[in-house]
């Protein structure tokens, strides 16, 4: 029924399909390659070749070839990684400084990127959180933010992923001084809501 030629073609297609699935599942990690102050590349690198290297150090190790890259045409002030959406893979949390349509003044924004079959895909490109974003970090399972208020005070708030974007979970401080908020923001102790 099938000729030898069709059997070989089917076998070749099957092996290419299975090989592609295997390579897409290799462990990858995010890194940042900064070319100058307003041009950076978010990179996916093989995770097994540079164990122990901190995420977001700003440089790719010499000789490392990125599996995927995403161009960021804005100044980047922070890269953090963590499993934001609970799927078992780390996402990249990238802090950029840029204007938006509704907030034309350049300010700190938060972008989330995920890995999809060895590619970088935008997950959420937020224009604003509750307050004026100063800094952020990932504290499983939350994105912890340090934000300023319009009256010069500071708050620390946790956000969690909710299918479309980040949703507010709790305040860890009320409106306090920058020093007090920064201490709470940097703390690794179990946190209680304010």
Question: PLM features: residue spans?
Answer:
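Bacterial N-terminal signal peptides
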Residues: 11-17
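Beta-propeller-forming repeat regions
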Residues: 21-194
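Bacterial N-terminal signal peptides that target proteins for export
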Residues: 2-10
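A general, composition-driven signal for non-globular sequence regions
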Residues: 1-2, 15, 83-86
């Amino acid at each position: 029924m099938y000729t030898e030629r069709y059997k070989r073609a089917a076998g070749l297609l099957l092996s290419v399909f299975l090989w592609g699935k295997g390579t897409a599942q290799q462990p990858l990690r995010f890194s940042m390659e900064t070319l100058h102050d307003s041009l950076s590349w978010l990179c996916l690198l093989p995770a097994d070749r540079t164990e122990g290297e901190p995420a977001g150090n700003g440089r790719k190790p010499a000789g490392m070839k990125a599996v995927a890259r995403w161009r960021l045409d804005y100044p980047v002030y922070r890269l953090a990684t963590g499993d934001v959406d609970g799927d078992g893979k780390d996402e990249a949390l990238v802090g950029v400084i840029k204007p938006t349509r509704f907030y034309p003044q350049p300010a700190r924004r938060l972008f989330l990127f995920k890995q999809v079959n060895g590619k970088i895909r935008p997950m959420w490109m937020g224009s604003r959180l509750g307050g004026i974003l100063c800094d952020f970090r990932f504290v499983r399972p939350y994105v912890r933010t340090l934000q300023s208020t319009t009256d010069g005070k500071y708050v620390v708030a946790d956000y969690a992923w909710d299918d479309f974007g980040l949703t507010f979970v709790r305040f860890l401080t009320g409106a306090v001084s920058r020093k007090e908020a920064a201490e709470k923001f940097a703390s690794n102790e179990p946190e209680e809501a304010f």
